[in-house]
A protein has these predicted regions:
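Hydrophobic/aromatic-rich structural module bridging two neighboring secondary-structure elements via a short loop
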Residues: 6-10
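Interfacial alpha-helical end/capping and short helix-turn segments at domain and membrane boundaries
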Residues: 17-135
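Membrane-embedded hydrophobic alpha-helical segments
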Residues: 1-4
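Eukaryote-biased recognition of C-terminal alpha-helical segments
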Residues: 138-141
Length: 141
């Protein structure tokens, strides 16, 4: 039996889901633009705009509203985001190498994003928990 979650929890989960979506979309779909600026100007000034997110300012108290699976999914997703941000801000690699690595990071980030969405949807009751196990297995393969 699924326990009904509070309205505050639903709101927090929706905010986290939307934040992850917007961040992922900026990272993935603006990659050609920010990589062009990086390779042409060797400037890192535009990266804060790409990687800005609300999760960085969420309190532990607010995160306590989330279930364990969602917390694990958030950690996995935002750790990869932070790894990408760190790499782009500190790399000495040549632009072609940077672009290859970023594309690999984006592919991995997409899997983490899909998993996070799955966990949030299950916790919000948008999909049944039994179907989520099947989808998670498919995501891993």
């Amino acid at each position: 039996m699924k326990v009904r979650i509070s309205e505050n929890t639903q709101r927090m989960l929706m905010l986290l889901k939307l934040d992850a979506r917007r961040l992922f979309e900026r990272i993935k779909y603006r990659a050609p633009e920010y990589m062009y600026d990086f390779s042409l100007k060797r400037s890192r000034d535009h990266f804060p705009e790409i990687f800005t997110n609300r999760y960085d300012s969420v309190s532990i108290k607010d995160l306590l509203l989330c279930g364990q699976e969602v917390l694990a999914g958030l950690d996995q997703f935002y750790t990869k985001v932070d790894e990408m941000r760190w790499y782009l801000n500190h790399t000495q690699d040549m632009p072609n190498r940077v672009e290859d690595k970023i594309h690999a990071h984006i592919r991995e980030l997409e899997k983490f994003y899909e998993t996070l969405n799955l966990y949030i949807d299950v916790e919000m009751g948008l999909i049944a928990e039994s179907s989520s196990a099947t989808e998670a297995d498919e995501t891993d393969n």
